[in-house]
Amino acid sequence: MAYTKTKIKDLVDGKIDRDTLHTMLSTPKDKERFQIYLEILQEQVEWDDPIILPLGPKLYIVQRKSDRKWMIRSQAGYDFCPWNENWKLHARIRVRDTAAQMEELYPRLMAPSPDWQVIREYFCPISGDLLDVEAPTPWYPVIHDFEPDID
């Protein structure tokens, strides 16, 4: 079953009704849905460089028109790095590593121990949008989520 661009936009915007969402999730994906999804995302950004692959909400692999390089870019237009590097190393990072910082998010007795877990929050340097969160042990290196096979 093929869905209209309007229905897919409702999905992207979080406005789709539950019945349609259930049907979408439980049936095979139609062939043109990903292309329509990219078109919708492209319409939501202010820059013209084509989106190659969305990495998450407000984070994309794009092809810069100026030099045709594939870059990881935020919705605000910040180019973090080439697509095959870890963009998190170029983001603004907040590390919650004290009990007081953990208690900003969790009730006191439910907060993780900062000796065993920290919370790393990655932000866009331009807009301040929260792009990702990880909760590793304090000594663990920055996690490189994945490198897509798109060459």
Per-segment meaning from a language model:
Residues M1-I119, F123-D151:
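N-terminal pre-domain and mature-chain start segments
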